[in-house]
């Protein structure tokens, strides 16, 4: 199985890097994980930022037309761990078994981006720093694999 995380910016603090790498190493037992970091554009107005960065994402995601694209969007349907696991499990059972998780820019996705035919998932209605969310996403991916394989995982 191939999993990609497309996101903006780099992890810049050692504790973020170490935490993410811990989960990435754990995930490697079950899937190939690749992180694609995009440079976020900052202009003066939030709406301009949303449009520029969302257009960059739309263009970048064209290369992954054979993947299921899942946008992590706080305003979308909340998924439980089990529901999230089902997304991964359903893709694992497909021949292509390719998923791209998209973490949007700091100003959020543009309306144009949200109108694309991508699955949208939320882990809740709280606002998190992007670097921390990347770790939480990796942890949930790892947890999903543990559940799918009936392996114990400390709760």
UniProtKB/Swiss-Prot annotation:
SUPFAM superfamilies: alpha/beta knot. GO terms for cellular component: cytoplasm. It is found in: Cytoplasm. Gene3D superfamilies: 3.40.1280.10. It catalyses: pseudouridine(1915) in 23S rRNA + S-adenosyl-L-methionine = N(3)-methylpseudouridine(1915) in 23S rRNA + S-adenosyl-L-homocysteine + H(+). Pfam families: SPOUT_MTase (PF02590). The keyword S-adenosyl-L-methionine applies. It comes from the Bacteria. It is an enzyme of class 2 (transferase). Its EC number is 2.1.1.177. Keywords: Cytoplasm, Methyltransferase, rRNA processing, S-adenosyl-L-methionine, Transferase. HAMAP family: 23SrRNA_methyltr_H. Specifically methylates the pseudouridine at position 1915 (m3Psi1915) in 23S rRNA. Belongs to the RNA methyltransferase RlmH family. Homodimer. This is Ribosomal RNA large subunit methyltransferase H. It comes from Mesoplasma florum (strain ATCC 33453 / NBRC 100688 / NCTC 11704 / L1). The gene is rlmH.
């Amino acid at each position: 199985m191939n999993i990609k995380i497309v996101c903006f910016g780099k992890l810049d603090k050692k504790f973020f890097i170490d935490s993410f790498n811990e989960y990435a190493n754990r995930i490697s037992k079950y899937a190939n994980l690749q992180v694609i970091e995009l440079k976020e554009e900052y202009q003066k107005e939030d709406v301009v930022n949303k449009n520029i960065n969302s257009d960059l994402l739309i263009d970048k995601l064209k290369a992954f037309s054979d993947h299921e694209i899942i946008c992590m969007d706080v305003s979308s349907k909340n998924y439980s761990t089990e529901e999230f696991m089902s997304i991964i499990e359903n893709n694992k059972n497909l021949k292509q078994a390719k998923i791209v998780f998209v973490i949007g820019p700091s100003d959020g996705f543009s309306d144009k981006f949200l109108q694309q035919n991508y699955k949208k998932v939320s882990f809740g209605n709280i606002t998190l720093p992007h670097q921390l969310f990347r770790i939480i996403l990796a942890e949930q991916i790892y947890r999903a694999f543990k559940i799918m394989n009936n392996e114990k995982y400390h709760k």
